[in-house]
Amino acid sequence: MRVPKFKEVKGFMAEACRQMLERPLYSFGISTYRVGVKVASAKNAKAQKLISGHKEIWDILDKKIDPSAKYIWIHAASLGEFEQGRPLIEKLKKERPEYKILLTFFSPSGYEVRKNYDLADCVCYLPFDTPKRVRRFLYKVNPECAIFVKYEFWRNYLEELYRRQIPTYLISAVFRPDQFFFKKRSAWYSYWLRWYTRIFVQNEDSRRLLAGIGVRNVDVCGDTRFDRVADIRSKGREIPLLQRFTRRGLPDHLPVMMVGSSWPADEEVYSGWFEKHPDTRLVIAPHEFDAERLRKIKALFGEGCVLMSEAEKDPSLVDNARVLVIDCFGLLSSAYAYCDVAYVGGGFGAGLHNINEAAVYDVPVIYGPNNSKFIEAREMAEAGGGFPIASKKDFEKAADMLMLNTDSSAEARKETGRKAGDYIRSKLGATDKIYDIIFKKG
């Protein structure tokens, strides 16, 4: 038997000491965060909802969890991650009805919108990741398996799931060199990733990054969001007010741009062009639409701007409008069906929103520069269906090519839109791949 070298023993001991210190420090950090949220809840509405929701967790679990049932636990941080996990939930309900679904959220923006999701048997917030709460939660639920969506690395949950030998999966994950797992000083955190039974990544680059730090429990399966947007399109939800406003398919139809998840920084980029081109129409779905936000949008675009909530009371308001503002939840992913060109917001701020929702309808998509975390932004541009911009001038150039009421612009819309749609269609199938690996073993 080979005697370990001193350097090897020293490295092993250093690693063991780091892990012994890391767990209590991490848990202390989570507890401190919890206290911080509680303090912030005095003035912050989102924090108030989070604290209020956490008070209800154990009552919800007591009422909804059937101790004799088998549960698949799916955790999504927020609404976007839920949409990524949704195709797998729907397939599970169809193919494996013997399982019940427990759905948890971290963010109020996910929980508040989907707390009554009909395909989940129980929906609640994820208890804070402290050892005591983790043990209590898993003792109560005792899931058959746990599925985390995209960016979820809750250290105590992962360790306890591993200790209890509960299969644990991360789906539609993306890894980048700038993440802390791959930094020299924090690379040792990579052992968290070994607690997953399997990690399903979106691309080969992510697999190679993980292999470089010794994580090999990885499959390249793609992104379930593509399956989700294809499903939304196939259901073909009709929105009569949008049809009346856009006059899609009618002789007097004018080019329509749909702006999804618009922020003030986005409006600074595109509003000026529309003032100069009265033979176009604009639909705006703001990311947030409180009264003050809507007032500012109406002031920016003037008398020709109508809110959907107003038009629902008097549909004739849209007949002479140039701008229609969608001031309600739940329509955006279907509303793209009524546009000729899409602009997806967030790229001039915190980060790009979902461009796949638009591209699936065979329309070209314009978006801002803060998109490096989204593989599809680069790939769609390479495919010829996406138009990344970095300035107002870039937007004007793209709009001049795609949005004019001319034959050449119509042809450009058709060609680039087809390329955007083809890109989406080339990415379908991630849900089936993941399902087969997890639930069709052997």
Positions of predicted regions on the chain:
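Nucleotide-activated sugar donor-binding and catalytic core shared by glycosyltransferases
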Residues: 1-442
